[in-house]
């Protein structure tokens, strides 16, 4: 039974313990003891889980880096699960998303775990859900970054409370957005790189004009915003 709690001061020893727990889940996932441990974490208090998804190169990692900084300034603890694609030939993965995160080495209230998607479909990894269950019992906020996705990778909706879908400026017209199945899952649509002002503004306008066609299961009024991780613009609004 883990003694970790979101109410205690999180130390480097706790980070090591958390890493060991996640490793145990990976190696011994189907064992009764591991399932009991997950049940224990599932009953604890829960942080808010945010999913960040979108096509490759849209700027998800850079935006998450800014979000982490903003949350830490407001004294929220943050856990991050960064899912990277795997090679179909070698089975390996370059776990490079975390290199975009500019995190203070001594900040024990931020924890980043990289994961390989392997052959799991849907934009996340097979162990994303159990890892999330553990981390949301410890951190105020958990951010899950999906692999770069296309039109049908929507599993991130099943493991998060809020989904942010990132859109590249000038990446397509309204019809392209409407064709995409993934446009049905976000709570927030975020146009990245808004320092490309004209392109960004046009994309935001296109999305706003077709907003009535976007729906999600909760009948939530989908928010549309824009940010620039490069210039740190729009992050407070997001």
Per-segment meaning from a language model:
Residues 5-50, 58, 67-152, 162-165:
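Nucleotide-state-sensitive switch-loop elements of NTP-binding domains
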Residues 51, 84, 145, 182, ...:
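Residue-level signature of catalytic and energy-coupling elements of molecular machines
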Residues 54:
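The Walker A (P-loop) glycine that initiates the GxxxxGKT/S ATP-binding motif of P-loop NTPases
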Residues 61:
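Walker A/P-loop
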Residues 146, 150, 158-176, 187, ...:
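Conserved Switch II/interswitch segment of TRAFAC-class P-loop GTPases
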Residues 185-190, 194-237:
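Canonical P-loop GTPase G-domain recognition
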């Amino acid at each position: 039974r883990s003694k970790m709690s979101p109410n205690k001061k999180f130390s480097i020893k706790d980070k090591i313990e958390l890493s060991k727990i996640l490793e145990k889940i990976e190696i011994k996932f189907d064992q009764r003891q591991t399932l009991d441990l997950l049940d224990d974490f599932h009953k604890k208090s829960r942080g808010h889980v945010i999913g960040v998804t979108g096509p490759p190169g849209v700027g998800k990692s850079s935006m998450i880096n800014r979000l982490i900084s903003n949350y830490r300034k407001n004294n929220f603890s943050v856990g991050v699960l960064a899912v990277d694609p795997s090679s179909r030939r070698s089975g390996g993965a370059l776990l490079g998303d975390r290199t975009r995160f500019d995190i203070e080495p001594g900040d024990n209230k931020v924890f980043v775990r990289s994961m390989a998607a392997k052959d799991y479909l849907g934009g996340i990894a097979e162990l994303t859900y159990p890892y999330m269950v553990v981390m949301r019992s410890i951190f105020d906020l958990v951010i899950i970054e999906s692999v770069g996705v296309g039109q049908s990778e929507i599993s991130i909706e099943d493991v998060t409370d809020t989904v942010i879908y990132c859109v590249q400026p000038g990446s397509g017209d309204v019809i392209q957005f409407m064709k995409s199945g993934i446009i049905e899952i976000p709570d927030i649509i975020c146009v990245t790189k808004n320092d490309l002002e004209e392109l960004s503004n046009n994309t935001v306008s296109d999305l706003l004009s077709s907003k009535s066609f976007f729906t999600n299961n909760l009948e939530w009024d989908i928010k549309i915003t824009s940010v620039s991780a490069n210039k740190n613009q729009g992050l407070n609004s997001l």
